[in-house]
Regions:
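N-terminal active-site wall of soluble small-molecule enzyme domains
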Residues: 1-28
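Surface-exposed amphipathic alpha-helical tracts and adjacent flexible/coil segments at the periphery
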Residues: 11, 27, 35-295
Length: 295
């Protein structure tokens, strides 16, 4: 594959699953023609800095962490025939487990029975340190995440890459990241070896916000900057924060200041209503509408 790529002038990067963790392996892949290395997840920042200058370095900065070394896990494949290396892992590491005595079959439930479920990586407060260590490309894990997650995480790290964040901006950024899917946060190996505190006890998500489907956009009037929502589920009220998601629109968030049904002002829109509201940004017919629920 390396020979084929070089012969056809196809650039290639070395995956984190190659576990590049030292100078010798970095130089080895450079000699083979690699243009970039995605570093092993088990390196601390001091070790990363030692690889600076050999090849451009990419590293994970945020997202779910596999309990296996650099993600080389076969548990899902072995138990369920779903290979993590083919993108279809069903995450058996996130399940609850018990200890079983082989001799008598006695079972013990652990205090934290999620013995393989790591917290999510979050390095937002340490982006500057990662830059100084030589990392120039920041990798976000987000397989299977919804548009709100992608929007929030990319937005916050984009800010951190564009300029050095103040302490207040980091705090506000962390609040934004906590609003979307997470299993609580850890710095992984970057600041030292993980401890038991870096394992999660969360069943699903520790997000401080969730979203409930409301309905779809049925009209949008660009000149008036207004449109209407057909409510198919639940209800919306004046003062609610909503997000509108569509393939072309992306994600737009706004607070409902006023609503009308049949040209009459209302405080609540119920299932079956077509509710007219102001829409400051362009949206499109059939975009999905969700109300944001704060926990």
């Amino acid at each position: 594959m390396f020979n084929y790529s070089r012969r056809n002038k196809i650039p290639f990067h070395i995956s984190t699953q190659a576990s590049v963790a030292n100078i010798a392996s970095a130089k080895f892949y450079k000699k083979l023609g690699a243009e970039r290395i995605i570093l092993a997840r088990e390196l601390n920042l001091k070790q990363v800095k030692e690889l600076k200058g050999i090849l451009p370095l990419e590293a994970f900065v945020h997202g779910a962490m596999c309990v296996a070394v650099s993600g080389r896990c076969f548990t899902s494949q072995f138990l369920f025939g779903r290979s993590a290396n083919r993108g279809v892992c069903i995450h058996p590491c996130r399940r609850s487990y018990i200890i079983k005595d082989k001799q008598e079959g006695y079972e013990l439930e652990l205090d934290n029975d999620k013995v393989m479920s790591a917290k999510d990586l979050c390095m937002l407060p340490y982006v500057e340190e990662m830059k100084k260590a030589g990392i120039f490309s920041f990798k976000i894990e987000g397989r299977g995440r919804d548009p709100r997650y992608v929007d929030a995480v990319v937005r916050e790290y984009r800010k951190a890459l564009d300029k050095r964040l103040t302490k207040a901006e980091v705090i506000e950024g962390m609040k934004e990241l906590e609003r979307v899917f997470n299993r609580k946060f850890s710095t992984g190996f970057y600041l030292g070896k993980p401890t038991p505190k870096d394992f999660s006890d969360i069943e699903h998500s520790a997000a401080t916000e969730s979203k409930e489907y409301v309905g779809k956009i049925v009209h949008f009037y660009s000149n008036a900057k207004a449109g209407s929502i057909k409510i198919e589920s639940n209800e919306i009220k004046v003062g609610d924060e909503i997000c509108i998601i569509g393939n072309t629109t992306g994600i737009e968030k706004m607070k409902i200041e006023s609503m009308q049904v049949n040209n009459l002002p209302v405080q609540v829109g119920k299932r079956g209503d077509e509710v007219a509201i102001k829409l400051p940004e362009r949206v499109r017919k059939n975009d999905d509408v969700y109300v944001i629920i704060r926990k």
